[in-house]
């Protein structure tokens, strides 16, 4: 049986909703404490980061709301909890910066992506400020105008 290949880019999953809902100000790279069955599921890209966030408690960071679906071939004597809280590994300096920023009004810490870094699984977390509804509409308008501009440039090149 052939082995499953890792994603060539290294990215396992992304949280696109977080980029839509928050102005991302700072990004951090954190290690994840995982069980064996979770690593196998991540190799098969069976993870969802939508609605996942980082909880800062007692000088530690915890990933909440991340759903890792267990494989059907996983062990039967290990009870797999797909939505359990997973510990994030960060430096003390990074934890202090996150804690002080999250205590300010309007800031949140969310998970952006899970990816491979050599043989380790890392989680990119970000410190962001929540967008209002009009901010989201403004971003969408900008994206649409950029798309229109790109279309115009491409069609002009084809006409020549």
Curated annotation (Swiss-Prot):
Annotated spans, Disordered: 131-160
Annotated localization: Cytoplasm
Source species, domain of life: Bacteria
Keywords (A to Z) from UniProt: Cytoplasm, RNA-binding
Main location: cytoplasm
Function noted in UniProt: Required for rescue of stalled ribosomes mediated by trans-translation. Binds to transfer-messenger RNA (tmRNA), required for stable association of tmRNA with ribosomes. tmRNA and SmpB together mimic tRNA shape, replacing the anticodon stem-loop with SmpB. tmRNA is encoded by the ssrA gene; the 2 termini fold to resemble tRNA(Ala) and it encodes a 'tag peptide', a short internal open reading frame. During trans-translation Ala-aminoacylated tmRNA acts like a tRNA, entering the A-site of stalled ribosomes, displacing the stalled mRNA.
GO BP terms, alphabetized: trans-translation
A single GO molecular function term of this UniProt record: RNA binding
Name of protein: SsrA-binding protein
Lineage of origin: Bacteria, Pseudomonadati, Pseudomonadota, Gammaproteobacteria, Pseudomonadales
SUPFAM superfamilies: Small protein B (SmpB)
Extent of the signal sequence: none
A GO cellular component entry from the record: cytosol
Family to which the UniProt record says this protein belongs: Belongs to the SmpB family.
Annotated TM spans: none
PROSITE patterns attached to this UniProt entry: SSRP
């Amino acid at each position: 049986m052939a082995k499953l290949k890792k994603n060539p880019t290294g990215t396992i999953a992304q949280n696109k909703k977080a980029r839509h809902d928050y102005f991302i100000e700072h990004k951090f790279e954190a290690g994840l404490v995982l069980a064996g069955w979770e690593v196998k599921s991540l190799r098969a890209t069976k993870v969802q980061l939508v609605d996942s966030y980082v909880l800062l408690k007692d000088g530690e960071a915890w990933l909440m709301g991340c759903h890792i679906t267990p494989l059907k071939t996983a062990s039967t004597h290990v009870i797999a909890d797909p939505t359990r809280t997973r510990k994030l590994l960060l430096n003390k300096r990074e934890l202090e910066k996150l804690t002080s920023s999250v205590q300010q009004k309007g800031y949140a810490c969310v998970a952006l992506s899970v990816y491979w870094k050599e043989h380790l699984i890392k989680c990119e977390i970000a410190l962001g400020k929540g967008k209002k509804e009009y901010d989201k509409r403004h971003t969408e308008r900008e994206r649409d105008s950029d798309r229109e501009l790109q279309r115009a440039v491409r069609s002009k090149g084809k006409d020549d």
